[in-house]
Amino acid sequence: LSSTATSVTVTNNGYYTFLLTAGDVTVSETVQVEKIDREAPTASVGELTSGTVESPKSGVYTKIVLPITYADAHSGVKTVQYSWTNSTVTPTSWSTLRTGAKTVAYTATESVLTTKYLHIKVFDNLSHTCTAYSQAYTVISQTAVENHAPTITIEGAPTAWTNDMATLTWRLSNYTGKNYEVILPDGKTSIEPNGQVWARQNGDYTVTVRDLDYGGKNSATIKVDKLDFDPPTVTVSGGSNSWSKDDQVITITASDSQSGVGEKWYKAVSNTEEIPTEGLTKLTGNTITVSDEGKYYIYYKIYDNA
C-alpha cells in the first residue's frame, strides 16, 4: 500500500494483517472480515413423507407431503417461498412458508389425473436466491376418486301380482373408458354396461358397480314384492255322508297370504273321476247349497290374484 492509503478493498472473509513501518518501528494490526456473502443459499426437495395419502390406484395421490431442506452458511436464510405447478418451469407466483417449516403439503382438488411439482425458492439476508423443485407426482382429488365409479340403476320389479319370475334390468352410466366390475345379487360379476337378473322370490335385489382404478363403488337396490308361487289354502266343511231330507250347505273357506284370494268356481259332480272343464259356477260367497236329490261331490277351483 502507499504511505498515503487510507483504505483497502478485500473480497473474501478472513483475517487481514496490516504492518505500519516508520524507521525502525513496525506496528501491526489484524482485522477480521466476516460479513461478506457472495454465495447463494442451498435448497432441496425430498421424497414423499408421512401424511401423504395414496389413492387405491398405485402412484396416484390425493394428498402429498414433501420434506424440504435449505441453508445459508453466511448471511443466513431470510425467507422460504413455495409454489405448486404442473411443470418444471420456474413459477412467477409464490407463497411464503412459515419460519422453520420442514415440509410442504398439497391436497389435490383436480377432477382428473394431474402432474404436480413442488418448487421452493430460498432467500438469504442479502437477497441471494436458490430454487429447487421436486420430482413429478400424479394427483387427483378425493372427491374425484369417490365419484370415479360409474353409476348404476336397476328396474323391472312387477307392479301387479304374478306367478312368474321377474326380469330385472340393470344399466350403467358414466362408464366409458373406466375399469369396473358389476357385482350381481347372486355374487357373480360382469364387465358389461348392462344386463339382466331374475328374481325368483320376493325381497331386495342389489347390484353394485365397483371402480377397479380407485376402489369407489355405487349400488342400486330394488324391492320385489309381487311374486306369488304358492296356491291358496282351502278348507271345506259342511255336508253329510248320510241321507237327508234337507238341503246340504257346503262352506268353502279360502285364504292366501300373498296375492290374496281371487275368483272361486265350483260344480256339483256325481263322481270323483270327473274333472269338469265346463259348466262351472262362480262362487261369490263362501257357501254352496245342494238341493237336488242324489249323491254329489263338490268340485272347486280357487285362484289367487297371481
Task: List the predicted regions and their residue ranges.
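Low-complexity, disordered linker/stalk regions enriched in Pro/Thr/Ser/Gly
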Residues: 1-306
